[in-house]
Amino acid sequence: MAKQDYYEILGVSKTAEEREIRKAYKRLAMKYHPDRNQGDKEAEAKFKEIKEAYEVLTDSQKRAAYDQYGHAAFEQGGMGGGGFGGGADFSDIFGDVFGDIFGGGRGRQRAARGADLRYNMELTLEEAVRGVTKEIRIPTLEECDVCHGSGAKPGTQPQTCPTCHGSGQVQMRQGFFAVQQTCPHCQGRGTLIKDPCNKCHGHGRVERSKTLSVKIPAGVDTGDRIRLAGEGEAGEHGAPAGDLYVQVQVKQHPIFEREGNNLYCEVPINFAMAALGGEIEVPTLDGRVKLKVPGETQTGKLFRMRGKGVKSVRGGAQGDLLCRVVVETPVGLNEKQKQLLQELQESFGGPTGEHNSPRSKSFFDGVKKFFDDLTR
């Protein structure tokens, strides 16, 4: 039976670039992958055709030979009759396409390093500014304490793979070419576990929860990340463990807002204090301190208290506390208070008194000029 053209199998033109071929391969491989078509022999056969076409058309030498001689270029040694061995190496195929998803890859595979873990830690502003030590509990994979990560039953050892003789690779003949592929027997590790550990069933790792004490340095902020080396999941078969990353999130504070190493807060004062000046108490993270408010203070004025902010997590200068004054309009006035305010307003020369309310005069002068310009 004549073999189908490789370009037709992938649905690309004979002038297709490599990226087009890879894109077509990914789409078709996902569609016909055996895991998605279990028990479907036609899909498995189609999948093998797709792999065969892909391996030829993405190799410049093989593609040139195929374009010149067609399938005859690979008949000696036979792609179809043993060139790829009995059955497709699915993990190796998807090592090219999806990387770590299926764990494939060329050549002997080293035991995989343990996965990194992430823990989201919420802190109060006070904890973030001063630093704190917290205990956390995380689910993870730890090295099996029976086989000590080897995966083999105590008293036994992993055996050298008889197919690849420990290299993790097998050589396949494809017409004019000899190529190396991941050993399908040991999946590239070079060893096999004949007598698996009864506790971890040959994986070398077991699921556990562990408690860690995490020291948070003073000055951290939302988005900062603390790395605990080697506290991630244990690696496979004795490989190094991954790391644990603690992601910091600082809760909103009822009084202070943080911007870099500076803190901001709003301080309400009554209009008499704003006009006459005086002394008030304002909060800081270290307690209350006194602040002198000069007379004629307007809403929005910022008072800087140096060194009352946050010390940089990287060392160096400490930030400041900036207090923004908000002048409050009095509410709930009794008749006497209203009368006094009325007399005060009259003493100003009305609502827009020029001398006592310079900003009001400036505003209304601007409004008058605006309308005068419109009527010209």
Curated annotation (Swiss-Prot):
Annotated positions binding Zn(2+) 1: C144, C147, C197, C200
Q: Which SMART domains match?
A: DnaJ
Which molecular function term from Gene Ontology is one that the record holds? heat shock protein binding
Q: Which domain of life is it from?
A: Bacteria
One GO biological process this protein is involved in is: response to heat
Annotated cofactor note: Binds 2 Zn(2+) ions per monomer.
Query: Where this protein primarily resides, as one coarse class?
Result: cytoplasm
Coiled coil ranges (UniProt) are none
Task: Spell out the subcellular localization from the entry.
Answer: Cytoplasm
> Which residues are in the J domain?
5-70
Database matches in InterPro entries: DnaJ (IPR012724), DnaJ_C (IPR002939), DnaJ_domain (IPR001623), DnaJ_domain_CS (IPR018253), HSP40/DnaJ_pept-bd (IPR008971), HSP_DnaJ_Cys-rich_dom (IPR001305), HSP_DnaJ_Cys-rich_dom_sf (IPR036410), J_dom_sf (IPR036869)
Zinc finger regions (CR-type), where?
A: 131-209
Q: List the disulfide bonds.
A: none
CXXCXGXG motif repeats by residue range: 144-151, 161-168, 183-190, 197-204
Q: Does the keyword Nucleus feature in the UniProt annotation?
A: no
Keywords assigned by UniProt, alphabetized? Chaperone, Cytoplasm, DNA replication, Metal-binding, Repeat, Stress response, Zinc, Zinc-finger
Question: What cofactor does this one take?
Answer: Zn(2+)
Q: How does it assemble?
A: Homodimer.
Role played: Participates actively in the response to hyperosmotic and heat shock by preventing the aggregation of stress-denatured proteins and by disaggregating proteins, also in an autonomous, DnaK-independent fashion. Unfolded proteins bind initially to DnaJ; upon interaction with the DnaJ-bound protein, DnaK hydrolyzes its bound ATP, resulting in the formation of a stable complex. GrpE releases ADP from DnaK; ATP binding to DnaK triggers the release of the substrate protein, thus completing the reaction cycle.
PANTHER family from the xrefs?
Answer: CHAPERONE PROTEIN DNAJ, DNAJ HOMOLOG 1, MITOCHONDRIAL-RELATED
**UniProt free text on domains:** The J domain is necessary and sufficient to stimulate DnaK ATPase activity. Zinc center 1 plays an important role in the autonomous, DnaK-independent chaperone activity of DnaJ. Zinc center 2 is essential for interaction with DnaK and for DnaJ activity.
Specify the protein name: Chaperone protein DnaJ
